[in-house]
A protein has these predicted regions:
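Extended alpha-helical targeting/anchoring segments
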Residues: 1-400
C-alpha cells in the first residue's frame, strides 16, 4: 500500500502545527459504493454514505463513505453538546455557547487543507440540520410538539473518508491527522497508515453472503399520516387567511407519514436508490436511528466564494414514451400556475443569495429549464452570487 504524502513532507507540515490528510488510492473497477459500505460499516456506528445520480440516470462523479468519527456535535432547541470521545456514545458535554456559535467554532477547528488532486470532501464534518434549526435563525413562535424526540442536528467528524471517483474509477481512502504535542510525526504517520491499512484490508475481504443478499422486491407498506384529510383542509384554509391578511406570502403545509419496517435501515436506502435515484442520496447511521433519503435539490451551496441556490418548482410526471415526455414538458412550461410558482421561488432565491453576496454579484445563470428524474420532471433555475467577505458558509446556509 502506497500512501501520500511522503514522510518528509508530512513531517514538515506536522512540525508546523497544521492539520493535514494522509491517503492511499486504489482501483475501483470491482467495487461499488454499496458493497464497500456493507464491508466497511459493519460494527462501525456513526457511519454514512452519500451518493449522487444526475438527471435521474447518470451516476454522479463522487460517492462518499465516512467512518469512525472522533468528534460528534449535536443540538436540540437552544442547547448544543459535543462528544470528543465518540467511541463512548454518552460522553457529551455542553458546548457553553448557543448552537450556531458552537457550530461555527466546530467548523473552524475542523478546517483542513485539501491537497490539489483530492476531492474537496476528502475531510470535514458531515450530518444533518433538521427543519427545527430554523428556530435558531428566525423567531417563528413556540416549538411544535416533538413526538419523535430526535436531535435537531447532528454532525460528525470522520477519521476515515472513502471516496469513489466514477470518472477515474478509483477509490481514495483518506484519514485526517491533527498535530498532537504528545505524539511524534513518525508515530502519527504510522497510526494514519494503520488506519488506512485496516480499511484496505476490509475492502479486500469477500462480502458476507447475508449482507450481499439483495434488499428484495418492492417494500409493500401502508403509510399512516399524522394528519386527517379534514385537518389538512383546515390547514389550507388557515394558510389562505394568513396570505389574505398579509402575514405570509409562502407556506409549506406538511404531514408526517409512518409505517412499520422490520428490515435494516440500509435495506430501505438500497430500495430508494433503485426506485428513486436523485442527485442527493444519503444514508446516515446514528445507532439508535438512521436518516435515509433521496432529493433532487440543494438547499444552498457555498463553494469557494460562490453561493448557489437552485429553485425547483413546477412538476409533471415522466412520460411513457419520448414523445409523451416532450409533450408533458411543453405542458409544464405553458402552465401559468406552475410558472408563477417557479418565478416566485426564483425571486426568493435571488433575495436569499443577495443577503450574503457582494452587491452587484447576484446573477441568474440558468432559468426555467427542465430537469428529468426517474419519475418526474421539474422546472429549475440557478442563482449565484459572490460571498461577501463579512459572511461565511454558515451565514449562507442561514440565508437559504
Amino acid at each position: 500500500m502506497q500512501i501520500e504524502p511522503a514522510a518528509d513532507a508530512f513531517g514538515q507540515t506536522y512540525a508546523a502545527g497544521q492539520a493535514q490528510v494522509v491517503w492511499t488510492t486504489l482501483v475501483a473497477d470491482l467495487e461499488t459504493p454499496v458493497s464497500a459500505f456493507l464491508k466497511l460499516a459493519t460494527r462501525r456506528p456513526l457511519s454514512f454514505l452519500l451518493e449522487s445520480v444526475e438527471g435521474g440516470a447518470t451516476r454522479g462523479r463522487y460517492s462518499i463513505i465516512g467512518l469512525d468519527p472522533d468528534v460528534v456535535w449535536r443540538a436540540n432547541g437552544p442547547n448544543a453538546e459535543i462528544n470528543r470521545t465518540a467511541r463512548q456514545p454518552d460522553a457529551f458535554a455542553p458546548c457553553g455557547a448557543p448552537p450556531l456559535a458552537a457550530l461555527r467554532a466546530f467548523i473552524a477547528e475542523s478546517r483542513i487543507d485539501i491537497p490539489d488532486g483530492l476531492p474537496p470532501m476528502a475531510a470535514g464534518i458531515f450530518g444533518y440540520l433538521g427543519y427545527d434549526t430554523v428556530r435558531l435563525i428566525e423567531e417563528i413562535g413556540p416549538p411544535n410538539p416533538d413526538p419523535i424526540g430526535l436531535p435537531d442536528a447532528i454532525l460528525v467528524r470522520p477519521t476515515i473518508v472513502v471516496i469513489f471517483d466514477a470518472v477515474k474509477n478509483t477509490i481514495t481512502v483518506v484519514t485526517p491527522v491533527r498535530p498532537d504535542q504528545a505524539v511524534s510525526a513518525k508515530s502519527a504517520l504510522a497510526r494514519a497508515a494503520e488506519r488506512l491499512g485496516t480499511v484496505v484490508d476490509d475492502l479486500d475481504r469477500a462480502l458476507d453472503k447475508e449482507q450481499a443478499t439483495d434488499a428484495g422486491g418492492p417494500l409493500v407498506v401502508e403509510p399512516r399520516s399524522n394528519t386527517t384529510p379534514a385537518e389538512f383542509q383546515r390547514m389550507v384554509l388557515a394558510a389562505k387567511d394568513y396570505i389574505a391578511a398579509g402575514d405570509i406570502f409562502q407556506v409549506v403545509l406538511s404531514q408526517r407519514f409512518e409505517a412499520p419496517f422490520g428490515l435494516p435501515a440500509f435495506a430501505l436506502y438500497r430500495a430508494i436508490r433503485r426506485i428513486n435515484p436523485a442527485p442527493f442520496l444519503f444514508y446516515l447511521d446514528y445507532e439508535k436511528f438512521s436518516v435515509v433519503g433521496s432529493s433532487p435539490e440543494i438547499l444552498v451551496r457555498a463553494r469557494g466564494d460562490t453561493v448557489t441556490i437552485r429553485p425547483i418548482a413546477g412538476t409533471r410526471p415522466r412520460g411513457a414514451t419520448p414523445h409523451e415526455d416532450k409533450a408533458l414538458e411543453a405542458e409544464l412550461l405553458a402552465d401559468p400556475k406552475e410558472c408563477a410558482e417557479h418565478l416566485m421561488l426564483l425571486d426568493l432565491g435571488r433575495n436569499d443569495v443577495g443577503r450574503v453576496a457582494r452587491i452587484g454579484t447576484v446573477t441568474v445563470t440558468d432559468q426555467f429549464f427542465v430537469e428529468r428524474y426517474s419519475h418526474v420532471m421539474h422546472i429549475v433555475s440557478n442563482v449565484e452570487g459572490k460571498l461577501d467577505p463579512r459572511h461565511d458558509a454558515l451565514d449562507a446556509l442561514a440565508a437559504g
